[in-house]
């Protein structure tokens, strides 16, 4: 064989080897996956509509859900994942809704799954390979572009750490407000958060009730500034419910911009949960305005001195976008595993409550 023929065969063999090479693949460490399966089932019910999934070469998986004045984000850390070729695995984003499987969250939270591969062999789509028992399925999911990952930006003017029991107490307190008006979905109930400095305390208020926490071993003030936040009570309940799934402490922060935005974060070794809440515009609500003025009078009596241990300068806050990606309207798609939804299962974020019209003060 002459030299030209040898070079031709060499190039052909190299091309065939390159074409047959497995594309960069992300997968779960199965032992870790089993450890986080139960919280993932709870997150699958909280993060459904208007949700995107981003795969990064760190590796990490970022699930982000956008609602009106609320963004919820779940990050699956590198301790749970591995990638066969980090140099050639590009960041990719898809919609949570996955034909044939119902949703990506439904796949990773299903205990029957024995293997899941996420492959990058095109910038236009993401390939899934899923096995469960004696079943094996493959699907190519189109990528979506222009989806912003919301991140905390700059220092916050407020940082308070709440232990898990305090988060549970807040959810029980919010339950009467968020559950008793389900019949009127268009009616929004508001919740106020009022922070005072001397002495440090945080108060949650609604039309029905209020609850207050002072500085203690369960509620630790690191930075504080007198402020009042006006939020949707339903958004606040969803944010705390998402953080409560991890059963760890939750950090509450307020980041300054044109107006303060509330930021909640809870984390463990494998998962991080973040919630970003924008304030609601209050109009034509005399009852709420009277209540707000009463609280503002209390705030004016507590001036923040320069050099105070609880003072923190204002920083610029990023813009929270509302991209609202298209999903299947309300219903459950064709599920590959034929798994029935059970909103009252042990994995649901459910809190019992006893209605109480009296004001509460919790000094721990």
UniProtKB/Swiss-Prot annotation:
Keywords attached to this entry: DNA replication, DNA-binding
Region (Disordered): 1-24, 284-306, 325-364
Function statement: Accessory subunit of the DNA polymerase that acts to increase the processivity of polymerization.
Protein name per Swiss-Prot or TrEMBL: DNA polymerase processivity factor
Xref: InterPro entries: DNA_clamp_sf, Herpes_PAP
GO biological process: DNA replication; viral genome replication
Domain of life: Viruses
Family under the similarity heading: Belongs to the herpesviridae polymerase accessory protein family.
GO molecular function, one term: DNA binding
Lineage of the organism: Viruses, Duplodnaviria, Heunggongvirae, Peploviricota, Herviviricetes
